[in-house]
Amino acid sequence: MRLLKKLFLILLFFRFAYVFACDLPGHFDFDVSNSIDEEILYSGCYDTVNLGPHIIEYILTKERAEARGVKRPSASFTQDRDGGVLQSLLAENGYSLPHHRDYTRSGYDRGHMAPNGDFNDTYENALATFFIANIWPQTPNVNRVEWLRTENKTRTLASEYLFVKVIIIVDEFTEERVGNIQVPLCFKRRVYDLYTGELIYEIDVYQLMEPEESDTL
């Protein structure tokens, strides 16, 4: 009975804890699901002005946080990891998604917001994070050190709390661009205990330096 109550509260929090800001002009929401059981892996609000996700949110479980059996997919970031739904929606409204190649030799990494490391329970789930609407330009230091540190902290919290809700917000930008993609100034991570709704981790990661030498291909 206690477990059922906890699961009910988790689902209730998942339903009402956050409302996307996709009523903003030029913003569109999307979901990326597992094609086998149709589980929503992560959701987002896509910003067509700056060409990346304004918000990404998902639930991270202890099981997924501790999964180690899947090798990182060697894959390009495509426009159709959601089955092409967002791409079609944008096209209907006169917008389009960037391409994997837009980042090539830019000096910036393709930085996951929902990282493949949080979905390592199956290869398909990890691959689903390689969605062009799930990334922003990040300097190599931010992507591989500072932001990675926040991802590792989040996985530690998921192991401790069993279920956490992760919200990534990107709403501040530099004047730099990668092609037409605006380079973010700050990446904001908020992690909540699903059982209590308590904010248990909050961090803003700024990238103020010029991009370093990157092997982005």
Question: What residue ranges belong to the model's regions?
Answer:
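Classical Sec-dependent N-terminal signal peptides that target proteins to the secretory pathway
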Residues: 2-21
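Signature of the chorismate-utilizing enzyme
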Residues: 11, 64-65, 189
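Extreme N-terminus nucleophile/cap motif
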Residues: 20-43
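Generic detection of long, well-ordered alpha-helical segments
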Residues: 34-35, 46-47, 53-56, 65-67, ...
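Short, His- and charge-rich active-site/binding loops that engage polyanionic ligands
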Residues: 39-109
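Domain-level detector of nuclease and nuclease-like folds
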Residues: 85, 92-217
